């Protein structure tokens, strides 16, 4: 097979404050993969951006590992492949870079192993590997999605929510924050009353989004009790960013995924001034407007 598989895979932001490990939204930052068979004796990698060049090129490469895991599950063998990679999704910043790579790996195994997975099956596989659907679901489908993974039945259920009519700003620090380190900051248990309170806030926030009530949704996004109180100290710029966003009447300022990126839901009439104010004042980060991605992963076959 000499055909080239081209994948364009969006970034994602998870949690939206109170939707811990459940809610996620796709963003217009992308991992681009171009994959074809090689006559070499092992998988080959060509990186076109500086961040990707730090990734391993042996069997510890994440895309290789996941693709082989999927192939083994369906009892198929994959040929040796050459993967060209270009990404504008920063690594370990809370923008779903690992979820994008995971989805890409499943698509690679599916095509070159001729597995014939449906998109629903891709979601089930990705969530089983990742452990929760908050990043992988919007990466696959696009848009804003709430989901639940039942780790007993291994089933994932998702519900699509209307795309918010807001401008999205991401404030990206220069430093990494590994998900594992961010998760270590979380408590092992919550009291029943704490869980009930956070669940009620999350439920109401989703309803507010569904009703396009961004004032209420934003207010509730900032009342999380599941993870943000335990992670904010890991992000030195969080309080300053939130203060500046509030001064510009933003709907909400929350941690994107495990951090350190900070996500802002901004009023459209204020977003330009806000992002410029952030770049003037928070010099250890880069702030930018980013569109919500509505299409999810895109696959194209180039026949040769």
From Swiss-Prot:
Stored InterPro entries: GHMP_kinase_C_dom (IPR013750), GHMP_kinase_C_sf (IPR036554), GHMP_kinase_N_dom (IPR006204), GHMP_knse_ATP-bd_CS (IPR006203), Homoserine_kinase (IPR000870), Ribosomal_Su5_D2-typ_SF (IPR020568), Ribsml_uS5_D2-typ_fold_subgr (IPR014721)
Pathway assigned to this chain's UniProt record: Amino-acid biosynthesis; L-threonine biosynthesis; L-threonine from L-aspartate: step 4/5
Broad class of the protein's primary localization: cytoplasm
EC category name: transferase
Residues involved in ATP binding: 90-100
Localization, UniProt: Cytoplasm
Catalysed reactions, semicolon-separated: L-homoserine + ATP = O-phospho-L-homoserine + ADP + H(+)
Keywords for this protein: Amino-acid biosynthesis, ATP-binding, Cytoplasm, Kinase, Nucleotide-binding, Threonine biosynthesis, Transferase
GO cellular component: cytoplasm
One Gene Ontology MF term: ATP binding
Superkingdom per UniProt: Bacteria
EC number: 2.7.1.39
GO BP: any one term: threonine biosynthetic process
Family: Belongs to the GHMP kinase family. Homoserine kinase subfamily.
Described purpose of this protein according to its UniProt entry: Catalyzes the ATP-dependent phosphorylation of L-homoserine to L-homoserine phosphate.
The protein, known as: Homoserine kinase
The organism's taxonomic lineage, starting at the top: Bacteria, Bacillati, Bacillota, Bacilli, Bacillales
């Amino acid at each position: 097979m000499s055909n080239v598989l081209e994948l364009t895979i969006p970034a994602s932001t998870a949690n939206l404050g109170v939707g811990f490990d459940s809610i996620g939204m796709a963003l217009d930052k992308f991992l681009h993969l171009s994959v074809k068979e090689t006559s070499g004796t092992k998988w080959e990698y060509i990186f076109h951006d500086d961040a990707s060049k730090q990734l391993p090129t042996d069997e510890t490469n994440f895309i290789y590992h996941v693709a082989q895991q999927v192939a083994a599950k369906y009892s198929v063998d994959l040929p040796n492949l050459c993967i060209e990679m270009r990404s504008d999704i920063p690594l370990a910043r809370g923008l779903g870079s690992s979820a994008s790579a995971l989805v890409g790996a499943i698509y690679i195994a599916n095509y070159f192993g001729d597995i014939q997975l449906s998109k629903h099956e891709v979601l089930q596989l990705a969530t089983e590997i990742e452990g929760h659907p908050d990043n992988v679901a919007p990466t696959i489908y696009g848009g804003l999605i709430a989901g639940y993974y039942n780790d007993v039945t291994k089933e994932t259920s998702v519900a699509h929510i209307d795309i918010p009519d807001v401008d999205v700003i991401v404030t990206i620090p220069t430093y990494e924050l590994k998900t594992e380190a961010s998760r270590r900051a979380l408590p092992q248990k919550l009291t029943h009353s704490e869980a009930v309170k956070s669940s009620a806030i999350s439920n109401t926030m989703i309803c507010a989004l569904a009703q396009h009530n961004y004032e209420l949704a934003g207010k509730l996004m900032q009342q999380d009790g599941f993870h943000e109180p335990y992670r904010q100290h890991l992000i030195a710029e969080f309080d300053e960013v939130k203060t500046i966003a509030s001064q510009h009447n933003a709907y909400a300022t929350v941690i994107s995924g495990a951090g350190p990126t900070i996500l802002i839901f901004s009023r459209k009439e204020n977003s330009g001034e806000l992002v410029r104010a952030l770049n003037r004042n928070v010099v250890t980060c880069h702030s930018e407007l980013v569109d919500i991605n509505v299409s999810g992963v895109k696959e194209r076959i180039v026949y040769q």
